[in-house]
């Protein structure tokens, strides 16, 4: 019910050497993202307003542990399950920190379906550069629209080195991912 992103990625990612994993719940999904990001993978998850609320604790842990990821939120306004009409509730949750703790997300807000596509690459680059979750905050109606989009020509980019990632000790001191430093 959230959006068509998982449907598309389930088909497309294996075609380009990626991996798609369907989680059993929003809470499981954000924890899978935490684990994959901690291992240095470029990783994303998507949901709508109520699902993002369920992911908030995991998002705060990721921000605290400085783990990069992309979170797509196709907004639903209002309390409970909400609706697809424009509202500010998910906006406040995204830009003011929706969970416990003192953290902020980088938030990109596309105005068109094409811009949603175009901002994905930028979101991953920003997440890696700042070691912080990045949220793409799409309007609920925008998430329901269907129109032709143009994908940029794929460019081979080398991923930023992630010496902090938990990739196995491999002749070095083990890395530890932690969101609390005493």
What residues fall within each predicted segment?
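Conformationally flexible catalytic loops at phosphate/diphosphate-handling active centers
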Residues: 131-182
């Amino acid at each position: 019910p959230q959006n068509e992103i998982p449907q598309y990625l389930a088909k497309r990612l294996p075609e380009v050497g990626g991996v798609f994993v369907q989680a059993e719940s929003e809470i499981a999904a954000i924890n899978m993202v935490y684990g994959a990001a901690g291992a240095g993978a470029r990783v994303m998850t998507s949901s709508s307003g109520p699902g993002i609320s369920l992911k908030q604790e995991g998002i705060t842990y990721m921000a605290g542990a400085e783990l990069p990821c992309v979170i797509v939120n196709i907004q639903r306004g209002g309390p409970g399950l909400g609706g697809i009409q424009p509202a500010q509730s998910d906006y406040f949750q995204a830009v003011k920190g929706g969970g416990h703790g003192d953290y902020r997300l980088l938030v990109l807000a596309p105005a068109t379906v094409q811009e949603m596509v175009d901002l994905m690459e930028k979101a991953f680059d920003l997440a890696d550069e700042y070691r912080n979750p990045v949220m793409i905050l799409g309007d609920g109606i925008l998430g329901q629209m269907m129109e032709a989009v143009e994908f940029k020509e794929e460019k081979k980019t080398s991923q930023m080195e992630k010496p902090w990632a938990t990739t196995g000790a491999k002749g070095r001191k083990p890395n530890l991912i932690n969101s609390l430093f005493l």
